[in-house]
């Protein structure tokens, strides 16, 4: 059970605060609800008895935030070449509410965006995943949204440079790697 003032994460929406716990009469049935204050002044009502099943959880601590940062600093994990399958796989990771899975989506889609661009759907997914990730890290690290967004971007940029030989021309790197030129 959560209390008023607790920082929580609601899958697919990000981190927020429990603003209140209220009883509502819906269709003649009294039900207790958490009133969640989410980013962008959005309020969400979640039945208290279904919160855990829905995936509402406490925010991560500082040591878990460090693990998130280390995921952002790794090379991308293998993703399907098929856009549709990749999209479904990433959506499942985001729906899980697991911040490490969300960090994986942010890093992988950021790499793909830098290498060859993203479709409109994947751009939207990247923006949503990044908002979810940053909103939780802001509360875990007690920092501003802008500061945390810069940290996330910098970690991804550093890892991209580290794991990609020449970010200007990945195709040239592949050709040079596999086709030796005799001098």
Q: Residue locations for each model-derived region?
A:
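A positional/architectural concept
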Residues: 1-56
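Charge/polar-rich, low-complexity and marginally structured segments
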Residues: 49, 54-183
């Amino acid at each position: 059970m959560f209390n008023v003032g607790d920082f929580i994460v609601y899958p697919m929406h990000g981190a927020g605060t429990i603003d209140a716990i209220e009883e509502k009469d819906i269709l003649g049935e009294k039900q207790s609800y958490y009133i969640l204050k989410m980013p962008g002044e959005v309020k969400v009502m979640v039945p208290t008895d279904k919160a855990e099943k829905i995936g509402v959880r406490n925010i991560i601590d500082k040591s878990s935030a460090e693990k998130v940062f280390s995921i952002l600093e790794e090379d991308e994990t293998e993703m399907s070449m098929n856009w549709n399958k990749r999209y479904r796989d990433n959506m499942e990771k985001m729906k899980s509410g697991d911040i490490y899975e969300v960090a994986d989506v942010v890093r992988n889609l950021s790499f793909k965006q830098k290498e060859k661009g993203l479709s409109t759907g994947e751009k939207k997914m990247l923006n949503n995943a990044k908002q979810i990730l940053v909103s939780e890290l802001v509360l875990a690290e007690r920092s501003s949204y802008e500061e945390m967004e810069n940290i996330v971007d910098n970690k991804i940029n550093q890892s991209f440079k580290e794991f990609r030989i020449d970010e200007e021309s990945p195709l040239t790197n592949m050709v040079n790697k596999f086709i030796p030129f005799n001098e």
